[in-house]
């Protein structure tokens, strides 16, 4: 299904120039086109979802960017525990590291693989909410590795996210003026949207 994301502009590379009035068209897992909104709307149309040759329209008060790359992905997901909201009274809501994490491991509940997996899923949600579109591993804990794979976030050794190009992966973030991620799209899937 085609989706036309109408935004205030597109920044195809991190810290690159902003193309005001540009938009992106997503076709499955790929970026079908990047260009001025009016041209894309004329070429792809907008209308009811599923209508032949017509794109669904999503409008955002932000700009499309490649998103952010998390170089410390392994440390954030394997050396920190992201508490369940039901644990907030006892553990707080911020990730636990160092001695607090060691003490948690010594507790009666301990840190079995299932708990690491749940922690990683919550950590990944935090990353997606921040507009993260790639991260660096390697991930040695099986439950964490599984959570990362299921999230769809690409594991990359590089210094940053890939530039946005027509025909390239539909992986990007939409950010507000203050840098807040409004939405994160990974391989064409809207995986996070700020309410």
Region spans (language model):
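N-terminal metal-binding scaffold of metallo-dependent hydrolase/deaminase domains
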Residues: 1-51, 160-180, 185-195
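Non-catalytic sensory/regulatory segments that transmit input signals in bacterial signaling proteins
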Residues: 4, 28, 103-107, 118
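Conserved beta-strand scaffold positions in the cores of enzyme catalytic domains, especially
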Residues: 53-58, 154-156, 184
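Active-site loop-helix segments enriched in His/Asp/Glu that coordinate
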Residues: 133-161
């Amino acid at each position: 299904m085609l989706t036309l994301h109408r935004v205030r502009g597109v920044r195809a590379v991190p810290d690159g120039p902003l193309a005001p009035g540009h938009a992106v068209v997503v076709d499955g897992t790929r970026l079908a086109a990047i260009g001025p909104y009016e041209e894309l709307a004329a070429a792809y149309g907008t209308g009811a979802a599923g209508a032949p040759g017509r794109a669904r329209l999503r409008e955002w008060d932000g700009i499309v960017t490649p998103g952010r790359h998390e170089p410390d992905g392994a440390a954030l997901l394997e050396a920190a525990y992201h508490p369940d909201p039901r644990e907030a009274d006892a553990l707080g809501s911020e990730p636990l590291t160092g001695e607090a994490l060691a003490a948690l491991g010594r507790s009666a509940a301990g840190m079995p693989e299932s708990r690491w997996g749940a922690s990683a899923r919550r950590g990944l949600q935090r990353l997606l909410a921040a507009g993260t579109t790639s991260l660096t591993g390697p991930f040695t804990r099986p439950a964490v590795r599984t959570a990362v794979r299921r999230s769809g976030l690409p594991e990359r050794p590089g210094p940053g996210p890939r530039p946005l190009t027509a025909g390239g992966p539909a992986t990007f973030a939409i950010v507000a003026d203050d840098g807040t991620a409004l939405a994160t799209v990974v391989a064409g899937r809207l995986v996070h949207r700020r309410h």
